[in-house]
Amino acid sequence: MPLYHNDDQAMLKDSVAPFVAEQAPVSHLRKLRDTADATGFSRGLWAQFTEMGLPGMLVPEAHGGLGMGHMEAGIVLEEIGRNLTPSPFLSTSVGAVAALAKAGGTQAGRWLPAIASG
């Protein structure tokens, strides 16, 4: 696996990095912590992630996703981690998508489009 970015991956990084830095600084995490938010993440921020198509980046196009690969997900995770962004991206957009893709069938048909749409 190459450790460099192609043009599409560089564009992804160039759009996600400033977005996360501006919309989800560490102070955002502290605010969620201090208010003891039950979800542990900002629904508004997740809605913005959805507008960018991030929840569905690993979801196959046949299920309404972007059909990207794990390298692209890694780029997003790197930026989320850099800013300590409280987000369900790893558990939902990576973990759940991998499990559902493996399960296939009606479960994948039901849940993958839902994940892709946020």
Where are these regions (language model features)?
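Glycine-rich flavin
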Residues: A21-G118
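Flavin-dependent oxidoreductase catalytic core characteristic
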Residues: M1-P25
